[in-house]
């Protein structure tokens, strides 16, 4: 009997154990769409289709792979999620290059689910603190005069938005975005944008009046961060940033407690 036949003829009771409790069993068969996806991905990575080039039409792909339209569409959708193709209505899929945003986008669903678990927000706030702490230290040591001017402009917009909560949130995000831009690393930018999006989405709804005092405190803390960066003092910039983010975390935690009591 061949090894394959011997494998196939094993019963559940006689099959060898793998690890502690697992027993050998046939691997699940791949869907047609997964096979099409893998083949197209390999063709793209081998440069058979270059960046910006259109893939064959759905009908041509159906004929080439001898599969139905649903399999082709599922395969193209999977490639889009990987950032390997762009799909616009009425046009053939076009080859693209994955970006840092593609990577973060794939994590978004898992991140939002994690945030909904007990302690999830605190873990992400700690991640943000560690991340931005490195950013401000880098900024204090390496920021150019032009980059410091951009921080000052973001700070000015911040000051003009104190009485408008929606505008202040936008200016607050923009201020921290300018910080994240200073190293010139697109992965840092993608991580930072995603972190803020995830955390802001998880915050409770708070009345505008309750936010006004918080806005003023945040603005003053932003000033302290910029002043330390302007003096090229990484230790002071780090202290100012940590004071700011710890204050923000405590404020939103208090808002959340108040909101829960009202429910």
UniProtKB/Swiss-Prot annotation:
Keywords: DNA-binding, Repressor, Transcription, Transcription regulation
Swiss-Prot/TrEMBL GO biological process terms: negative regulation of DNA-templated transcription
Residues annotated as domain HTH gntR-type: 30-98
Family matches, as InterPro entries: GntR_C, TF_FadR/GntR_C, Tscrpt_reg_HTH_GntR, Tscrpt_reg_NanR, WH-like_DNA-bd_sf, WH_DNA-bd_sf
UniProt keyword DNA-binding present: yes
Pfam hit, one: GntR
Cysteine pairings via disulfide bonds: none
Region described as Disordered: spans on this chain: 1-24
Top-level lineage group: Bacteria
GO MF annotation list: DNA binding; DNA-binding transcription factor activity
UniProt DNA-binding region: 58-77
PROSITE patterns tied to this protein: HTH_GNTR
The keyword RNA-binding belongs to this UniProt entry's keyword annotation: no
Family: Belongs to the NanR family.
Role played: Transcriptional repressor that controls expression of the genes required for the catabolism of sialic acids.
Name of the protein described by the UniProt record: HTH-type transcriptional repressor NanR
Originating species: Escherichia coli O127:H6 (strain E2348/69 / EPEC)
Lineage of origin: Bacteria, Pseudomonadati, Pseudomonadota, Gammaproteobacteria, Enterobacterales
Record gene name: nanR
